[in-house]
Amino acid sequence: MPTALCPRVLAPKESEEPRKMRSPPGENPSPQGEPPSPESSRRLFRRFRYQEAAGPREALQRLWELCRGWLRLERHTKEQILELLVLEQFLAILPWEIQSWVRAQEPESGEQAVAAVEALEREPGRPWQWLKHCEDPVVIDDGDGPAAPQDLEQERMSAESQSYPDAPPGALVQGTGLLSRSPGQPSEDLVPQDAFVVQEQSIRDAQPVATCQLPPNRVSPFKDMILCFSEEDWSLLDPAQTGFYGEFIIGEDYAVSMPPNEPPVQPGHSHEEENGLRVTEWTTDLQDKEIPQASCLDLSSLQPFQGEERRKWEELQVPELQPCPQVVLSQSPCPAGGDPPALKSSLDQEVTIEIVLSSSGDEDSQHSPYCTEELRSPPEDLHSVPAHQSNASAEGEVQTSQKSYVCPNCGKIFRWRVNFIRHLRSRREQKPHKCSVCGELFSDSEDLDGHLETHEAQKPYRCTACGKSFRLNSHLISHRRIHLQPASQQPMKKSEEEALETEGTGASDLLEKSKAKLSFQCGDCEKSFQRHDHLVRHRRHCHLKDETRPFQCRYCVKTFRQNYDLLRHERLHMKRRSKQALNSY
């Protein structure tokens, strides 16, 4: 037989302890003189009600006392307090069956709680193996253990009875996490809500979920039902699902049915699914009656449907689509006026596409004298566009595209910045702009304009020997040195150098010798120098000694022609005297 599920599981430690009576709400179960344990303070803090206090100030003071007893502010740090809060919330969000077992382990941190849950999941059958039949579990409360399930059920049933005062005694009521009977029914038939209603998200979220309605006032717990699969379908289930359904049962021998004490159902109201799972319906007409969601069992997500089988299952749940009505077009003349265009005869198969040309809508009235006010069409006709609308749409595309990138060179307009940058790069690779003066090529017209300015700039410095002009005086001076050299010592031209290089090794040796010739010669002593500054230094020190030297040193008899040389010489005297003064001390 399949494994049945019971919503109440007794913790291992509680079953071994002696039977105790529950303490009244708000009373401290600890011995006199001893403070309550943190777990007791936590439960009292969570279960505290406003009606237990005399007023709002007393209620707030009581909450402060319980919170301090739970978190122990004088002992714990901020990180430890945060760990306690996270652990309490983690245990609260666990399923009820696993939560009872984990709380019985008394974890002190979130890591210990996670390790306990993981150890429970790693064992064979996963958490469902620990869910077993239990008659009436012993309720034990010593102030440190978890809350008993019976009290939580009573509180939940009382809250649900207030929410549904008109519900019949035997009806199922949907609560926050459980599908339970009304307060008049016994608590042994309580089953988890997830076992009866399984939500499935699909592309048909807008359609109501087709479920099987149980007979009124005859609701059986999920543990007494039998889920039967074929041998082929059983092999497709994973270990978690096989642990959930229990042992293998042949589909021809059993079906999803009521317990044996229930009367048999009519064979006309049951249908078989191709995947081996049989679902029995106790309703006569699903289309005429509304199906209450609280008393429904949806087994669609429990089946390993794939491919064609899943499509057939969805077809059984979703009604057939009705044919879509024909296209309804209503036209009215635009304010601009004009004659209506000739429409085709088959308007029911055509779809007009409206293109907004501007945010204000002023340009729309200039292109089409008729505007479409209402349009309904099946989605399969969206590809067909009438001929009289294609031209208007083409014009709209040209006007709506904001081409804000203009090439400054060729004047092309681009809508996207990427295409504009790609065009500029291609322009840089090409050099279509040529200088009319020197013939240099440029990729941009701006570069060419900047280059032409160099040709048109003023050159006030002109050479008197050859007539060349220069913008800077330093360029003119370096140019005049060529004319000061003798004709035999002037540097060779480029054409002569190229001719000597092409003649052979002897010509190349001659070229090196000609370059090694001294090109600057002194006019007084006929000495030659390779550089002009060497010649100037030679004339200053050798041939200009007889000239007057007006600058004389104050510390020695040396004279100088320039004041700069005198200052540099006196600086040496000052350094020498400062060293002597330091050595004297």
UniProtKB/Swiss-Prot annotation:
Please give the name of this protein: Zinc finger protein 496
Query: Does the keyword field hold DNA-binding?
Result: yes
Reported function = DNA-binding transcription factor that can both act as an activator and a repressor.
GO MF: DNA binding; identical protein binding; zinc ion binding
Q: Where is the composition biased (Polar residues)?
A: 387-397
Which family does the record assign? Belongs to the krueppel C2H2-type zinc-finger protein family.
Instruction: Give the location in the cell.
Output: Nucleus
Kindly state which keywords UniProt assigns to this record, in alphabetical order. Activator, DNA-binding, Isopeptide bond, Metal-binding, Nucleus, Phosphoprotein, Repeat, Repressor, Transcription, Transcription regulation, Ubl conjugation, Zinc, Zinc-finger
Q: Where do the segments described as Disordered lie?
A: 1-41, 141-167, 358-397, 483-506
Main location as per UniProt:
nucleus
Residues with the modification Phosphoserine, per the entry, are 182
The annotated crosslink position for Glycyl lysine isopeptide (Lys-Gly) (interchain with G-Cter in SUMO2) is 13, 494
Motif position, Nuclear localization signal: 575-579
Gene encoding it?
A: Znf496
Extract the InterPro entries matched here: KRAB, KRAB_dom_sf, SCAN_dom, SCAN_sf, Znf_C2H2_sf, Znf_C2H2_type
Q: Where are the zinc fingers (C2H2-type)?
A: 405-427, 433-455, 461-483, 520-543, 551-573
Task: Give residue spans, biased composition: Pro residues.
Answer: 26-38
Entry annotated with the keyword Transcription regulation: yes
Tell me which residues make up the KRAB domain.
220-294
